[in-house]
């Protein structure tokens, strides 16, 4: 006898004409290519895959080497008889482990009732809404989950939780626990009566306190008054003194009012003189010394060279002869040195020497036996010029610059030394020190802004240790090549030369020097720009750089 055929999910439910003897479907034999195995039950059996009878199981049952077995977790194992057992589990009190299994240890007031742990209670404790509570009656109360004691306005809880009476002073309870009245002078308690001690000027009149008075005090009605006469008065319920000119009340004293020029000396008012004044026989006079004169009026004794200038409201001025080489520069007398033959060097007036001249051993001008020719291949400021640059203030730096032409290359040496202001003492705002030298289309130095060299600075062809008196007419051969360094081009890397140097020649004070060729955008000629950065790291020190070299391609 054959079992009925298991219906597959892909077959319609109405396919109930299966023939177990002839199992092949006449309409589609591909669905059942063989005869299925004997009967299956939905309880733990299944036909999977089709035509194969297998068990239907779930975790913890698994198969291992073709046999059924169980997955075992922690604390579970099989003994040698194939029995499922548990291992001893570590427990802590109150859960002891016995041969009967885990139990619970307890003690009173805990107990087990109806297999449940419960709490035994006695009045005034009770269990309400599955919570332990306390049954109370007045004056005991429960407020905000705390047990309290109701009290009235005259009672209070003292320290230690004792109930007592709230007694304001002067009521007290001494050690006898009797309510008494505390009294202090002038009150007394005699023979269970409250009394009052009095002394003059207080007295008793008809059982009432009264005040005995004598002039200038008197009583009007129930008020004590003070009789006053000028200059005394009563102001704002206080006795005061009325004052006139020269007097005032200061603090609690009547004092004299004094103005400027007066002072107290041992309680006596005296004139306070200072700044060229003194007192003589009760009079204030001027105490002067030369060059002042105070015989009649205060005047100034003048010597030669000083005059009163009527055009300046009779101010005292210096009388100089501007026709003899003197002039005013600001508020200072200066030498008016003309452009020819004279110059200033290290703040000294000096004669300019041209070609063929020199100073003799006794500092006289003499002719050179052999005139020193000038060098047309070198332009410079002389090797040690005086202050010749204005960067932050007038003549605050000394620039030493030498340009030497070598075929198509110009080699340069530069050094800058600060002599005053922010360059003598570097400030936090002095982050970069820089200067421009601007040249016209012929390579001649432009002595106006933005050129840093002042107009009177030495600049020209090298001749001996000075500059040639011959003017620089064409110096294109010393100029930066505009094809190599187009203008303006301050941001072009090719137009810059960078080198590291050291402030004051100290290798522990590194700074960076940058030379820019034709970088000034305000000119159509040529320019050299020198910048030193990183100087703000050395505050209050003198800005001074070593001699640094640089090179560039010449225009010609």
UniProtKB/Swiss-Prot annotation:
InterPro entries: Adeno_fibre, Adeno_fibre_knob, Adenobir_fibre_prot_rpt/shaft, Adenovirus_pIV-like_att, Attachment_protein_shaft_sf. Residues 1-22 are annotated as: Disordered. SUPFAM superfamilies: Fibre shaft of virus attachment proteins, Virus attachment protein globular domain. It comes from the Viruses. Induction: Expressed in the late phase of the viral replicative cycle. Keywords: Capsid protein, Host nucleus, Host-virus interaction, Late protein, Viral attachment to host adhesion receptor, Viral attachment to host cell, Virion, Virus entry into host cell. The keyword NAD does not apply. It is found in: Virion; Host nucleus. One of its GO terms (cellular component) is host cell nucleus. It holds the Pfam family Adeno_knob. Forms spikes that protrude from each vertex of the icosahedral capsid. Interacts with host receptor CXCAR to provide virion initial attachment to target cell. Fiber proteins are shed during virus entry, when virus is still at the cell surface. Homotrimer. Interacts with host receptor CXCAR. Interacts (via N-terminal tail region) with pentons. The tail region anchors the fiber to penton base capsomers, whereas the shaft, built from several repeated motifs, allows the knob to protrude from the virion. This is Fiber protein. It comes from Human adenovirus A serotype 31.
